[in-house]
Regions:
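Catalytic/RNA-binding core of pseudouridine synthases
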Residues: 1-240
């Protein structure tokens, strides 16, 4: 087993195909996939190791997640259609850090019942078979070992959107991730917000197998009534 690093804007299929080109004489498989906009460590198995892939599917993982305040999309990251937004002057970092800190920080291990994210593979497959299925139909219990705020701050809004567009533009154009519509959306918002800053907090999450980071942020957003979305989901380690 070797650990490889996936960059943001790369789909899981593109990632594994790149590895296969480097090891043309070996059977290859991977586990612990990452969403296109996420980055970080992915374990890759070779040859007979693939027979033991099940041994690598229930591992705990650590993420650092930059959560943007005031915007929310249907995908809960920047590769999504905006559901709602709120002027940054009505939401401050003090609101989040002082008034809502308890929603973001967990010191002791808990089990939560979590929906499968709307854009998760299982939910997508279910809807392809039955359009009446929603992510509400699928839940599972997952472990959250700890969650804490490790950073907070603000970014220049236009520079941040430019970074978002650059990453979105890398996503496989042979697949329909709604890239054109989403990029046009961010361009429009960029041009209507002059001299604006956007606030963020960075969470460090230590979680169990099957934990949906984007769903976790959506659930917090729904609970506190403040638009939130993931910008940078970075898997920093896997506990082997």
């Amino acid at each position: 087993m070797l650990e490889f690093y996936k960059e943001p804007g790369i789909t899981p299929l593109e990632f594994i195909n790149t590895i296969k080109k480097q090891y043309t004489d070996k059977k290859i498989c991977y586990t612990a996939r990452l969403d296109p906009m996420a980055r970080g460590i992915i374990p890759v198995l070779f040859g007979d190791e693939c027979k033991n892939m099940h041994l690598y599917t229930n591992l705990s993982k650590t993420y650092e997640v930059k959560v943007m305040i005031g915007y929310k999309t249907d995908s809960d990251d920047v590769l999504g259609i905006l559901e709602n937004s709120q002027n940054k002057n009505t939401i401050t970092l003090d609101d989040i850090v002082l008034n809502y800190k308890s929603y973001f920080e967990v010191e002791n291990e808990i089990t939560i019942t979590q929906k499968y994210h709307y854009f998760s593979t299982k939910a997508l497959l279910a809807r392809s078979k039955n359009k009446n299925n929603t992510n509400e139909d699928y839940t599972h219990d997952v472990k959250l070992f700890s969650s804490k705020i490790i950073d907070s701050g603000e970014l220049d809004f236009k520079e941040w959107i430019d970074e978002c567009i650059t990453i979105i533009d890398k996503v496989d154009k042979t697949k329909d991730f709604r890239q054109k519509e989403i990029i046009e959306q961010w361009h429009k918002i960029k041009n209507t917000n002059i001299n604006m800053k956007i606030h963020y907090i960075t969470l460090q999450l230590h979680v169990g197998s099957g934990f949906f980071v984007r769903q976790y942020i959506r659930d917090i957003s729904d609970t506190i009534g403040i638009p939130l979305m993931c910008y940078d989901i970075h898997r920093t380690s896997i506990s082997f």
